[in-house]
A protein has these predicted regions:
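C-terminal region of N-terminal signal peptides and the immediate post-cleavage residues
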Residues: 28-34, 49-83
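Short, acidic/polar
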Residues: 112-124, 194-204, 288-295, 362-369
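Terminal targeting segments of Actinobacterial cell-envelope proteins
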Residues: 1-37
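Boundary/entry segment of secreted carbohydrate-active catalytic domains
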Residues: 73-116, 349
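Mid-to-C-terminal alpha-helical segments outside catalytic/metal-binding sites
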Residues: 395, 399-424
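Second-shell residues forming the walls of enzyme active-site clefts
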Residues: 99, 141-148, 243-401
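Glycine-rich, aromatic-flanked loop segments that form ligand/cofactor-binding clefts
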Residues: 151-177, 197-221, 241-265
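Hydrophobic faces of well-ordered beta-strands that scaffold small-molecule active sites
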Residues: 104-112, 128-132, 158-165, 212-216, ...
Length: 424
């Protein structure tokens, strides 16, 4: 309901003064006497009008018992702005009871070996997400034990992620069957066929309890198939990548999974392999003309996540990997990449086994730096470091090295990712 401002009360319009001239009226007075009386009369009328206006605009409305919860029983004066209605109650109910350590644990996603490992890290440390890796025992996806863990009482449900791109990156091949690489799909199939492939595989993944697929890869490259990105890319031009990666993301989304675009801000033309060591992309000005276009086009179809890679970007990251750079997260969040400000969940790439990170950071420090920079979820591939990571993060919060506002910002993003109805 819009706020209404009081309408100014106009003084009564003056009618014809004295029908006829003074000599035609009985008991005519002098001009000066008439002027004094006229001024007094007008003043009196003004006082009366002002009094009426004050009474009218200060009188409260009768209480409308049909109003909804936000305004039940509240008498709102005409002309006063209405108090904004908060719609964040469900979100606060979900995250409010969490301790600081539990809040921090929600920002972690860790690889697990089997269901016992998963149970331990979830029940003992309250981590918000687990990652199904190539070495994970997949029986937990088939025997219902993962599903049991997901329905256990918790403030927020457990997120379960996987890297399932097709081609070289298939963690669930034994359960889903083989899928051609992204490059092969774009060369041999229509976009609609790719959509259906992703939807069919996504539906099976969802039935196993998976909630997130770190796919599609939206990097742009014409590099040989066996290079770091190579055939993981749908093509060497933005148009092809947008069409086919968009279809793949839509299929996953329609199957009930969260698709995650990667590797922001673009690994396709970077020099080197971030699994081994530092890599560098072209300057940001060049990335905007090609590598960032898929993010610009595909980030508007929701829900969708983004994974930030470990590349260094000249004139942007100041020698830091992108996943550790506040400038990169601002680029995404503020729309500096050329698209709308991104409001979905943002993940790091693996922080524990990729040379671009491990040469410079321990896992606890890498997690801390990435969360400080702007990541919502820090990803790595084993559970052993979880206690040390949480200890380090708690110390960082206590010393204000990691602000409570940053923790809450990331936590709200994670909560909405897990339950979109909590958005406010």
């Amino acid at each position: 309901m819009p706020a209404f401002a009081p309408v100014p009360v106009s003084a009564p319009a003056a009618g014809p003064v004295g029908v006829g001239t003074p000599e035609h009226r009985p008991d005519a007075r002098s001009d000066s006497t008439r002027s004094v009386l006229l001024i007094a009369a007008v003043a009196l009328l003004g006082v009366v009008a002002l009094t009426v206006a004050v009474v009218m605009f200060s009188k409260p409305r009768p209480v409308d018992t049909s109003e909804t919860a936000a305004g039940v029983g509240a008498a709102v004066p005409d002309g006063a702005p209405e108090t904004p209605v908060s719609t964040c109650g469900p979100l606060q109910a979900a995250i409010g009871p969490l301790t600081m350590r539990q809040k921090l644990a929600q920002l972690l996603m860790v690889g697990v070996t089997d269901i016992a490992d998963a149970r331990s890290v979830v029940r003992d440390h309250n981590v918000g997400g687990i990652f199904i890796a190539s070495w994970s025992d997949l029986s937990m996806l088939q025997d219902g034990s993962l599903r049991e863990l997901q329905v256990a009482p918790a403030a927020l449900p457990l997120a379960v992620s996987v890297d399932e791109e097709g081609g070289r990156v298939q963690r669930l091949k034994s359960l889903l069957g083989a899928q051609p690489s992204a490059r092969e799909l774009a060369q041999q199939s229509s976009a609609e066929q790719v959509y259906q492939i992703a939807k069919d595989r996504g539906t099976k993944m969802r039935s196993f309890g998976l909630t997130i697929d770190f796919a599609p890869d939206v990097d742009i490259t014409d590099a040989p198939d066996n290079t770091v990105i190579g055939d993981r890319s749908f093509g060497n031009d933005a148009t092809t990548v947008v069409e086919y990666a968009g279809a793949y993301a839509r299929g996953l989304r329609d199957a009930g999974l969260l698709p995650v675009l990667k590797h922001f801000p673009g690994h396709g033309r970077a020099t080197g392999d971030s699994h081994v060591g530092s890599v560098t992309t072209p300057p940001l000005s060049e990335l905007k003309t090609s590598d960032l276009i898929p993010y610009r086009e595909l980030s508007t179809a929701k829900p969708v996540g983004v994974m930030v890679g470990h590349m260094q970007v000249p004139d942007l990251t100041d020698g830091l990997p992108a996943s550790m750079s506040a400038a990169v997260y601002r680029l995404l969040r503020d729309g500096g990449y050329g698209g709308p400000p991104f409001t979905g969940p943002v993940f790091t790439d693996d922080l524990s086994s990729m040379g671009a990170i491990t040469q410079y950071y321990s896992v606890p420090e890498a997690v801390l730096v990435s969360l400080k920079a702007g990541a919502d979820v820090a990803l790595w591939v084993s559970t052993a470091e979880v206690p040390a990571v949480l200890d380090r993060l708690e110390l960082a919060v206590a010393s204000q090295e990691l602000t409570i506002d940053r923790v809450d910002e990331a936590l709200k993003s994670v909560a909405v990712m897990k339950n979109p109805q909590l958005a406010c």
